[in-house]
Amino acid sequence: MGSQEVLGQAARLASSGLLLQVLFRLITFVLNAFILRFLSKEIVGIVNVRLTLLYSTTTFLAREAFRRACLSGGAQRDWSQTLNLLWLTVPLGIFWSSCLGWVWLQLLEVPDPDVVPYYGTGVLFFGLSAVVELLGEPFWVLAQAHMFVKLKVLAESMSVILRSVLTALLVLWLPHWGLYIFSLAQLLYTTVLVLCYAIYLIQLLRSPESAKQLTLPVSRVTQLLPSISRSRAFVNWKEAGLAWSFFKQSFLKQILTEGERYVMTFLNVLNFGDQGVYDIVNNLGSLVARLIFQPVEESFYLFFAKVLEREKDASLQKQDDVAVAAAVLESLLKLALLTGLTMTVFGFAYSQLALDIYGGAMLSSGSGPVLMRCYCLYVLLLAINGVTECFMFAAMSKEEVDRYNFTMLALSSSFLVLSYLLTSWCGSVGFIMANCFNMGIRITQSLSFIHHYFRESPHRPLAGLRLSPVLLGVFILSAGITSVSEAFLCCERGWPARLAHIAVGTICLGVTLGTAFLTETKLIHFLRTQLGRSRLSDKMT
């Protein structure tokens, strides 16, 4: 498969994921706004911070390294060995779920059962849901490696929407069930997710032989299960070694990704109510990251991993592939920069209004608006880091991954210390400040890698981080106008003033986007080309 074809599939995966995710995120956004009206801050804090941390830690430690290792490399591989390796995530998940569940029940502070009932049941069900999701890991990797565009988005959309619907119904009808509600909803989510992948692949294997040859490297359902053969090793030891390197890294990356939740959970720097408010603001602030950056990062990680070879310098690889990879990276960096700047500039002036509409006075009063404004700056760093690390992890050799683990260890340690100190000093805003600091360090590391990678080639993809002076001036002007508008029109002067404030922001946003369209012609050409390819591919499939 050529680099242009892989690029087209990656763009198709990203664009399809983006459009469908916008749809189902809007649905869940409305459902979650409804649910918040019926919950206490304490229950939100327990579910969204502590129990979700149990679930995410279990799944991350059990599968992240296997995902990265098994999605790397070319098409020439023994998929039976790869599937055997992926099935090891299930016993790993049982191990981590059991260990972490004991910690959550025996070592951490147990909430008041009158305020948050059925905490033990919640721990059990969230740990179980993590193991259930790991049962679908071989199917997920197989589908992702072969770029089944609509399957991933459809499965995630259906499972998230069903979880939100069940939560809303139970909160409305049986509010006294407490954590039973969220436990059942989480188990439904993982079950539906696994069934979507399993049913799709099983049906595909039962389709006519010609269709199977064009898609999957297996021909029978039983080949999806673990298998032992005397003629070959149980797993590919090169993949297993790479997975071990990524596992050491993933352990540290998890601390960086969920560091504030670990500090809140283990060091008790915030009460459960404050944890709930922080997490709501965190989820709302990261909405753009989940809608845009995550699909792009996942899809183009696949592109870079397939086009580039890990063990070779750029000068020793096919120069056509290197040129395409450099051009794509430059465009992705520009897209991330523009999206992040837009969020930062307009987020500052519209944070309080957004929180008031979404959650009422519980969010728009107190520390909520300050948290949201700080998070808007963090989104800019998050956008750039997502693209740079996406390329770096796809191009690193095993030895470079091992060396980078030491950097991650230092970052993880500094993040935990910095989070604790800043939170003790300035409250929950300290978490975002610590995240910004560490994200800046990670961006510096990945930019250094990219610069070194392309040093011997004529390509300079880091030019994507430079804006035209005209567009930069429009961003600054928009920031000033919307800040003045907020001071005079928002948010205590009623809905007519609020609507006027929204109108001012809409005009400024339109001018900003129009300027970007006229000045960033290279990015516009890239988007038109790849979106056009994805639409053509959709029509042909």
From Swiss-Prot:
Pathway: Protein modification; protein glycosylation. GO terms for cellular component: endoplasmic reticulum membrane. It is found in: Endoplasmic reticulum membrane. The chain crosses the membrane at residues 16-36, 45-62, 85-105, 123-143, 154-176, 187-207, 335-355, 376-396, 414-434, 470-490, 499-519. GO terms for biological process: dolichol-linked oligosaccharide biosynthetic process; glycolipid translocation; protein N-linked glycosylation. Keywords: Endoplasmic reticulum, Membrane, Sugar transport, Transmembrane, Transmembrane helix, Transport. InterPro entries: RFT1 (IPR007594). It is a multi-pass membrane protein. Intramembrane glycolipid transporter that operates in the biosynthetic pathway of dolichol-linked oligosaccharides, the glycan precursors employed in protein asparagine (N)-glycosylation. The sequential addition of sugars to dolichol pyrophosphate produces dolichol-linked oligosaccharides containing fourteen sugars, including two GlcNAcs, nine mannoses and three glucoses. Once assembled, the oligosaccharide is transferred from the lipid to nascent proteins by oligosaccharyltransferases. Belongs to the RFT1 family. This is Man(5)GlcNAc(2)-PP-dolichol translocation protein RFT1. It comes from Mus musculus (Mouse). The gene is Rft1.
